[in-house]
């Protein structure tokens, strides 16, 4: 419950965090949906570490790759919209956290791994996906959508 939020300023800060992450997800999803040439294949082919075999298997199966692409595009879009609107807050923050952790596990920022895509800087272990997953965990722990969001209206009879 959000009773753990100490004051209004903290509540608004957490709502802003939720909305900003939602915007990032929504933008990434829509950008992929609008690009007829987008595919997760390049990302998957660059996978290193424990899931590289799974990534190559996904790319080698067109129907599985299409499913993964659609799950990515629509998942990002719907999770982002729900985070912005404060709808199904705890569920979508957990789904979003799991999604970016999958991205992290396929391409972790370990210093001994080299990727074809140029990096955004020199990460040791922590990258933007890990940070966003942790931020979504905070959003999960403090479900602000129960106070500021559609969850307040949709689930008002359950509280």
Regions inferred by a protein language model and the residue ranges of each:
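Extended, low-polarity transmembrane helix blocks
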Residues: 1-45, 49-78, 85-159
């Amino acid at each position: 419950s959000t009773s753990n939020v100490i004051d209004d300023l903290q509540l608004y800060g957490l709502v802003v965090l939720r909305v900003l992450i939602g915007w990032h997800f929504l933008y990434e999803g829509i950008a992929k949906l609008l690009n007829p040439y987008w595919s997760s294949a390049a990302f998957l082919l660059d996978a290193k570490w424990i899931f590289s075999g799974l990534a190559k298997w996904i790319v080698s199966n067109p129907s599985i790759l299409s499913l993964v692409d659609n799950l990515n595009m629509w998942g990002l879009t719907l999770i982002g919209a729900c985070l912005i609107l404060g709808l199904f807050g705890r569920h979508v923050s957990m789904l979003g956290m799991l999604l970016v952790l999958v991205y992290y596990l396929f391409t972790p920022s370990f210093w001994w791994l080299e990727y074809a895509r140029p990096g955004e800087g020199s990460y040791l272990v922590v990258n933007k996906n890990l940070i966003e997953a942790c931020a979504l965990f905070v959003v999960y722990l403090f479900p602000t959508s129960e106070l500021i969001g559609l969850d307040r209206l949709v689930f008002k009879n359950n509280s």
